């Protein structure tokens, strides 16, 4: 990349971020070291023939330093900048999508990555993708759900249902004995009533003779 172009990119980058012509996904990604990362940039215009990929190592500002990694050209393919490890960075196109593939990332690869096209007369940048490279991915803390106390429902005891015969043998014996006593008493009462009646009739016959 020519020095004049490098200075031009650095001077205009801060004011031209986030143009809707270039849409980048994802906006943020976190990966472990030695893993692979693929960033994408969608060009709204189908006439795009060259696209650049840049990396910003610090938070965006007017004095931020931007590093041009590589660019893709429709006639030349992938062109890497000087000092860039070519085996680590791959740039390719699939239709309206342009991809930046990073392999075996390290902690120093963290930063914000931008795709860019040279317009007329301005430079057009994508929305940017923030890459964070860590040794160990943070574990997601599980949210504890508050247990809702259950309402205590008072239930009345159910009457026990007895199974088997309703009366025991002793109860049946007492019941039969009571019936027999009643029958005997009734028989004695009837017998006495009959004797009294016969005696009354006999007395009346003797009285009227």
UniProtKB/Swiss-Prot annotation:
Cytoplasmic compartment: which residues?
191-209
Q: Where are the transmembrane segments?
A: 170-190
The entry's comment on post-translational modification says:
Phosphorylated as a consequence of T-cell activation. Palmitoylated at the cytoplasmic tail and thereby targets the heterodimer CD8A/CD8B to lipid rafts unlike CD8A homodimers.
The job of this chain, per UniProt, is described as: Integral membrane glycoprotein that plays an essential role in the immune response and serves multiple functions in responses against both external and internal offenses. In T-cells, functions primarily as a coreceptor for MHC class I molecule:peptide complex. The antigens presented by class I peptides are derived from cytosolic proteins while class II derived from extracellular proteins. Interacts simultaneously with the T-cell receptor (TCR) and the MHC class I proteins presented by antigen presenting cells (APCs). In turn, recruits the Src kinase LCK to the vicinity of the TCR-CD3 complex.
Q: Sugar-bearing residues?
A: 101
- What is one process in the GO biological process aspect for this record? adaptive immune response
**The keyword Disulfide bond is annotated on this UniProt entry:** yes
In Pfam terms, one family for this protein is V-set
Signal peptide feature range? 1-21
Which UniProt key words apply to this protein? Adaptive immunity, Cell membrane, Disulfide bond, Glycoprotein, Immunity, Immunoglobulin domain, Lipoprotein, Membrane, Palmitate, Signal, Transmembrane, Transmembrane helix
The terms describing its cellular component in GO are: cell surface; plasma membrane
What is the protein name for this chain? T-cell surface glycoprotein CD8 beta chain
Q: How does it assemble?
A: Forms disulfide-linked heterodimers with CD8A at the cell surface. Interacts with CD3D; this interaction couples TCR-CD3 with CD8. Interacts with LCK.
Q: Which PANTHER family match?
A: T-CELL SURFACE GLYCOPROTEIN CD8 BETA CHAIN (PTHR11292), T-CELL SURFACE GLYCOPROTEIN CD8 BETA CHAIN-RELATED (PTHR11292:SF7)
Say yes or no: keyword ATP-binding present. Answer: no
Top-level taxon: Eukaryota
Where does this protein come from, organism-wise?
Answer: Saimiri sciureus
* Membrane topology of the entry: Single-pass type I membrane protein
Q: List the disulfide bonds.
A: 41-115
Location, primary (coarse class)? membrane
């Amino acid at each position: 990349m020519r020095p004049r172009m490098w200075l031009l990119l650095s001077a205009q980058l801060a004011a031209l971020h986030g143009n809707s012509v270039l849409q980048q996904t994802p906006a943020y990604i976190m990966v472990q070291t030695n893993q692979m990362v693929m960033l994408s940039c969608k060009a709204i215009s189908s006439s795009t023939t060259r696209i650049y990929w840049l990396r910003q190592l610090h938070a965006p500002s007017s004095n931020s330093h931007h590093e041009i990694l590589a660019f893709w050209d429709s006639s030349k393919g992938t062109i890497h900048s000087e000092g860039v490890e070519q085996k680590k960075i791959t740039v390719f196109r699939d239709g309206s999508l342009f991809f930046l593939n990073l392999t075996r990332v390290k902690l120093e690869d963290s930063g914000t990555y931008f795709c860019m096209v040279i317009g007329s007369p301005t430079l057009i940048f994508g929305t940017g993708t923030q890459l964070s490279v860590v040794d160990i991915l943070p574990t997601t803390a599980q949210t504890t759900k508050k247990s809702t106390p259950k309402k205590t429902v008072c239930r009345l005891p159910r009457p026990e249902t007895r199974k088997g015969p309703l009366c025991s043998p002793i109860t049946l014996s007492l019941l039969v004995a009571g019936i027999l006593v009643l029958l005997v008493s009734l028989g004695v009462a009837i017998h006495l009533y009959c004797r009294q009646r016969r005696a009354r009739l006999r007395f009346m016959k003797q009285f009227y003779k």
